[in-house]
């Protein structure tokens, strides 16, 4: 592969859950000689397979049966700390390695923060943070609840408070930690990032789908996960790990975990999981709609071949790829 740009080429297929990103990405990767880099904050964890819709190794193949390399899947255990800064570092190293092999790196997934940490010049400061400040904030959250941290963040960084969910403890702690250790709001770093140019020659696609169809697919996906053994998967994880770990608060694992602890009935857990997945899809759409560099494709499940070919052609023309 060669490109006319002096920047490293990078392609991406992002969008809400259940829009068919994995299926389309395999076809696009096969056409372009690409290697896929997962952009999913839950697929990094080993043992979390069904609930994250992780493709099995034998499913990571193109239409001709040839393997499509996948990266940043199954890289840490659920009890290992892993941050967006860790992801950024590994993803950028992987991008460079793929290009050196003469292939195109293709980001695929729906975790908006991970995606933007790679394609934009995100700065993570202070490096490593301050464990004492972090511990203090964790203790405040345990004593007064996540909503208390969110109120504190509103006072010092209202822009960040708008972006961070009131119950996303990890990100609330991080935002307050940055303010307490630097005196600067974390939103200032985001504003700086928005003013800078991407370090990559980017061809980025986002997938969408009519909402009624998307919601039907979400319902069917959750039912399929239950049938495939999600309850057993969560049970195995809870036998080894503390359910309060950030990894096990991921979508699917939190709801089924509550059922296994007998806090709710299975029927209620499934209904909550479907509702939370719909809410996730809405948040993902909102996040990606803010990025004007994304070129949107509405997915018709009956026209996957045509859509995949069109996306591959768009990427090829945008980056001026010559596949060798």
From Swiss-Prot:
Listed EC numbers: 2.5.1.75
SUPFAM superfamilies recorded: P-loop containing nucleoside triphosphate hydrolases
Keyword flag Nucleotide-binding: yes
Alphabetical list of Pfam families matching this protein: IPPT
Residues with site note (Interaction with substrate tRNA): 111, 134
Segments of this protein annotated with the region Interaction with substrate tRNA: 40-43
Top-level taxon: Bacteria
UniProt binding sites for ATP: 15-22
InterPro entries in alphabetical order: Dimethylallyltransferase, IPT, P-loop_NTPase
Function in brief: Catalyzes the transfer of a dimethylallyl group onto the adenine at position 37 in tRNAs that read codons beginning with uridine, leading to the formation of N6-(dimethylallyl)adenosine (i(6)A).
UniProt subunit comment: Monomer.
Family: Belongs to the IPP transferase family.
Name this protein carries in UniProt: tRNA dimethylallyltransferase
């Amino acid at each position: 592969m060669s490109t006319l740009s002096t920047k490293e080429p990078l392609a991406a297929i992002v969008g809400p859950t259940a829009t068919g990103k994995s299926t389309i990405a395999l076809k696009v990767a096969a056409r372009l000689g690409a290697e896929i880099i997962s952009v999913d904050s839950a697929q990094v964890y080993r043992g979390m397979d069904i609930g994250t819709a992780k493709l099995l190794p034998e499913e990571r193949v193109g239409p001709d049966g040839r393997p499509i390399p996948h990266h940043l899947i199954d890289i840490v255990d659920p009890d290992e700390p892993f941050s967006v800064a860790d992801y950024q570092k590994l993803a950028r190293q992987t991008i460079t390695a793929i290009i050196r092999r003469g292939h195109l790196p293709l980001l695929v997934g729906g975790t908006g923060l991970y995606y933007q940490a790679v394609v934009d010049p995100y700065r993570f400061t202070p490096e490593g943070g301050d464990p004492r400040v972090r511990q203090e904030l964790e203790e405040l959250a345990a004593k007064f609840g996540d909503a208390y941290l969110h109120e504190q963040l509103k006072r010092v960084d209202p822009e960040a408070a708008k972006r961070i969910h009131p119950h996303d403890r990890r990100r609330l702690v991080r935002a307050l930690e940055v303010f307490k250790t630097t005196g600067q709001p974390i939103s200032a770093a985001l504003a700086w990032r928005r003013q800078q140019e991407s370090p990559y020659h980017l061809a980025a696609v986002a997938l969408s789908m009519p909402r009624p169809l998307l919601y039907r697919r979400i319902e069917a996906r959750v039912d399929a996960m239950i049938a495939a053994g999600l309850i057993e998967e969560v049970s195995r994880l809870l036998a080894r790990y503390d359910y309060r770990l950030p990894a096990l608060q991921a979508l699917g694992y939190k709801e089924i975990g509550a059922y296994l602890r007998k806090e709710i009935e299975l029927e209620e857990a499934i209904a909550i999981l479907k509702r939370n997945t719909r809410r996730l899809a809405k948040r993902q759409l909102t996040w990606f709609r803010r990025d004007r560099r994304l070129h949107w494709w509405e997915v018709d499940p009956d026209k996957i071949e045509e859509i995949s070919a069109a996306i591959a052609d768009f990427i090829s023309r945008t980056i001026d790829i010559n596949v060798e």
